[in-house]
From Swiss-Prot:
<dbReference type="InterPro" id="IPR020094">
    <property type="entry name" value="TruA/RsuA/RluB/E/F_N"/>
</dbReference>
<dbReference type="GO" id="GO:0160147">
    <property type="term" value="F:tRNA pseudouridine(38-40) synthase activity"/>
</dbReference>
<keyword id="KW-0819">tRNA processing</keyword>
<dbReference type="GO" id="GO:0003723">
    <property type="term" value="F:RNA binding"/>
</dbReference>
<feature type="active site" description="Nucleophile">
    <location>
        <position position="54"/>
    </location>
</feature>
<dbReference type="GO" id="GO:0031119">
    <property type="term" value="P:tRNA pseudouridine synthesis"/>
</dbReference>
<dbReference type="InterPro" id="IPR020095">
    <property type="entry name" value="PsdUridine_synth_TruA_C"/>
</dbReference>
<feature type="binding site">
    <location>
        <position position="112"/>
    </location>
    <ligand>
        <name>substrate</name>
    </ligand>
</feature>
<dbReference type="Pfam" id="PF01416">
    <property type="entry name" value="PseudoU_synth_1"/>
</dbReference>
<dbReference type="InterPro" id="IPR001406">
    <property type="entry name" value="PsdUridine_synth_TruA"/>
</dbReference>
<comment type="similarity">
    <text>Belongs to the tRNA pseudouridine synthase TruA family.</text>
</comment>
<keyword id="KW-0413">Isomerase</keyword>
<dbReference type="InterPro" id="IPR020097">
    <property type="entry name" value="PsdUridine_synth_TruA_a/b_dom"/>
</dbReference>
<comment type="subunit">
    <text>Homodimer.</text>
</comment>
<dbReference type="InterPro" id="IPR020103">
    <property type="entry name" value="PsdUridine_synth_cat_dom_sf"/>
</dbReference>
<comment type="function">
    <text>Formation of pseudouridine at positions 38, 39 and 40 in the anticodon stem and loop of transfer RNAs.</text>
</comment>
<protein>
    <recommendedName>
        <fullName>tRNA pseudouridine synthase A</fullName>
        <ecNumber>5.4.99.12</ecNumber>
    </recommendedName>
</protein>
Amino acid sequence: MTRIALGLSYDGSSWQGWQTQPHGQTVQDTLEAALGQFSGTGAPLDTLCAGRTDTGVHAAMQVVHVDTHLNRRAESWVRGVNAFLPSSISIHWAKEVGEDFHARFSARSRTYVYLLWRGRVRPALWAHRAGWCFQPLDVTAMRQAAQALLGEHDFSSFRSSQCQARHPVRHLTRLDIAERGSFLVFTLQANAFLHHMVRNIMGALLQIGQGRESVDWMASLLRARDRRLGAPTFSPDGLYLSAIDYPTLFELPDLDGGSSLLAPFTA
């Protein structure tokens, strides 16, 4: 058996999340079917991913691995599998890796970017690709509140009731808020994320930005470890899985591909 790592992007608005579902249109099901068609067997090939995205969440760079008996050049994987995929999913690169590589467990960190449009009316050209807030936001207060979340914490106040993670402790190493014209760009990096963690953090930051809660509320919410005390879960529309960090020994290509796709906002 050969293990192949694949880097891909997708428009999450077309799909009911990454993970396979019995009666759902998911990225995983569609990719595995395309891999089966490319292999010539017609039977879906099982994949494992770096991070399972929810319904409506996009990926500028997702990484998966697949075990196969096929012997093909990297470019054949890219062009061949893309030929069986819809336009909302695209393979960017492929690389043969050793059995010691695992798309999920070998990853050292994941980075998400959230694009938020600030404007009086919703942006039609950014429908499903950016979140929207029409109220004025105190960006300074939001940045101050974000500092309370950096480091290793129990993020129970920011996990969904459906979260299947074995424990709620995560290490958040980055939470930046940049202003890019009418957009606010939120960049979050952690060793891993809980279900709805980024969207629940976004909800809390917006409560503070709108003056509904104080800057200190973020720290008290974190200490409470109670999701019922948090803000509503924010829209998935502007959320992008943008980068996966792996040890250099795996020599994976174009791991900054997601950052490149979002470069007008993150540069």
